[in-house]
Amino acid sequence: MTMESREMDCYLRRLKQELMSMKEVGDGLQDQMNCMMGALQELKLLQVQTALEQLEISGGGPVPGSPEGPRTQCEHPCWEGGRGPARPTVCSPSSQPSLGSSTKFPSHRSVCGRDLAPLPRTQPHQSCAQQGPERVEPDDWTSTLMSRGRNRQPLVLGDNVFADLVGNWLDLPELEKGGEKGETGGAREPKGEKGQPQELGRRFALTANIFKKFLRSVRPDRDRLLKEKPGWVTPMVPESRTGRSQKVKKRSLSKGSGHFPFPGTGEHRRGENPPTSCPKALEHSPSGFDINTAVWV
């Protein structure tokens, strides 16, 4: 009994030590989680502040008589939530919370949750302002391919549709003048209205121009090839077909002479078959189907 009691005491001590170590680890994790939550809430506040600054810049700047106009409009929903007028000052860029103040985290979270709600209401104005010049002058190369073709001719696609599309796209005229006009028009507007969609469209147009120049350098020159090798564009399909029909006709004649060794039957075949077989071969060759080719090839 004494040995068992000693073993039980040892096990209990080990359990107590493990519980103490787990408690210490849990306290450390709790502190780390608190620090991470504080950092996330500060990031949210910074996001709200940058969004407000972008809205102020995109709005063309406040009226000289009221410098705090756009900011007060964004702060009205905070007052409607039942909080005092001193709470919305957290949204201003001048006030920055510290990392050590862990007691203010719930208030920051509530302020962030209420400040993020009115932002989508005011952002459509910015998106509409950004979509305005894009609707007037689209940068999509497919629309230019369909509408701004060479000599305003309809788009004709052959067997290899992708190759025809790329060829027609390479034949399109350059749109550098339109881009310069867009840049001069955008210079009059404030800098804040140049959003991410316009920047992405500009970068895509730049990469498309580089790709187009590369393909034009790789593509063979048709005029030079026509001078060196005239007639390389149009393959001689009818001549090959007629040559094939003549070869098959010779084969059939030689085969016929082998099957009919008697002179009477040979003369009978020579007298009757040539006027009938030659017109048939000449008639069926342009259609692309020949009986002789179906038999022997």
Swiss-Prot record:
Q: Which GO terms describe its molecular function?
A: protein kinase binding; protein serine/threonine kinase inhibitor activity
Spell out the subcellular localization from the entry: Nucleus
Q: Which InterPro entries match?
A: FAM212, Inka
The record's principal subcellular location, in a coarse class, is: nucleus
One Pfam family name from the record?
Answer: FAM212
Asked whether the keyword Nucleus is assigned, the reply is: yes
Q: Name one GO cellular component term.
A: nucleolus
**Organism superkingdom:** Eukaryota
Q: Spell out the Gene3D superfamilies in the cross-references.
A: Phosphorylase Kinase, domain 1 (3.30.200.20)
Comp. bias intervals (Basic residues): 244-253
Region spans: Disordered: 82-109, 175-200, 234-285
Q: Compositional bias (Low complexity) spans?
A: 92-102
UniProt KW Ubl conjugation keyword: no
| Family indicated by similarity | Belongs to the INKA family.
- So what does this one do? Inhibitor of the serine/threonine-protein kinase PAK4. Acts by binding PAK4 in a substrate-like manner, inhibiting the protein kinase activity.
Assembly, per entry: Interacts with PAK4.
Q: What is this protein called?
A: PAK4-inhibitor INKA2
Organism of this sequence: Homo sapiens
**Lineage of the native species?**
Eukaryota, Metazoa, Chordata, Craniata, Vertebrata
